[in-house]
């Protein structure tokens, strides 16, 4: 039930070091801010966590509505194990009438984010055929980590692709075939929108 839901880490709609060959569907609605104990990630696909893992997902569909979420939303899964490979086919994300929030700390801002694809790091490979992100009346705020108060109504960041989080000497690879982003709604508030992906971390040069 709603009263028993609490999220303190990542949510994966897929498997652990094992993919789902048929379609994955994740539906979230009427979630509230107090269900999230810390800022995490909501992944539509599977997680590759061990060295050399090979994970293959089919199509992925994510539907989120009427919610207040303190997390990043990622259409694909996550590839973390060294030399692991996580692959997915086509992702469709629809987010409606929802707030996706982040936090601020020492003048650094991490907004809530929507990624059409997944996340890769630690020398892994993430590959996806296509993404399709549709938003309707989506906004977001940031919270001051020191006092928990709203510090900025900056909006949400949207990436049609995924995230390659690199450390120094990290050879992680992120490959996305095509992306599509559609923005609707008079109440939508956006910090930034990118059709592609982001490379971040200490090894992002």
At which residue positions do the language-model features occur?
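Surface-exposed loop/turn motifs in large extracellular/passenger domains
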Residues: 1-72, 78-194, 198-205
């Amino acid at each position: 039930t709603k009263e028993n839901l609490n999220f303190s880490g990542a949510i994966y709609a897929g498997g652990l070091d094992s993919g789902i060959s048929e379609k994955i569907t994740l539906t979230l609605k009427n979630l509230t801010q107090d269900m999230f104990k810390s800022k995490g990630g909501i992944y539509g696909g599977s997680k590759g966590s061990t060295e050399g893992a090979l994970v293959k997902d089919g199509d992925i569909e994510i539907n989120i509505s009427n919610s207040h979420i303190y997390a990043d939303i990622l259409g694909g899964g996550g590839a973390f194990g060294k030399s692991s490979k996580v692959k997915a086919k086509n992702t469709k994300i629809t987010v409606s009438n929802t707030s996706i929030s982040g936090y601020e700390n020492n003048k650094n801002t991490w907004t809530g984010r929507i990624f059409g694809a997944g996340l890769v790091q630690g020398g892994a490979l993430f590959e996806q055929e296509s993404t399709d992100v549709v938003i309707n009346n989506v906004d977001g705020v940031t919270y001051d980590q020191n006092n928990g108060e709203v510090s900025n109504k900056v909006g949400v960041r949207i990436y049609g692709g995924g995230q390659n989080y690199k450390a120094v000497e990290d050879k992680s690879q992120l490959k996305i075939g095509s992306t599509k982003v559609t923005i609707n709604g008079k109440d939508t508030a956006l910090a930034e929108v990118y059709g592609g992906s982001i490379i971040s971390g200490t090894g992002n040069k």
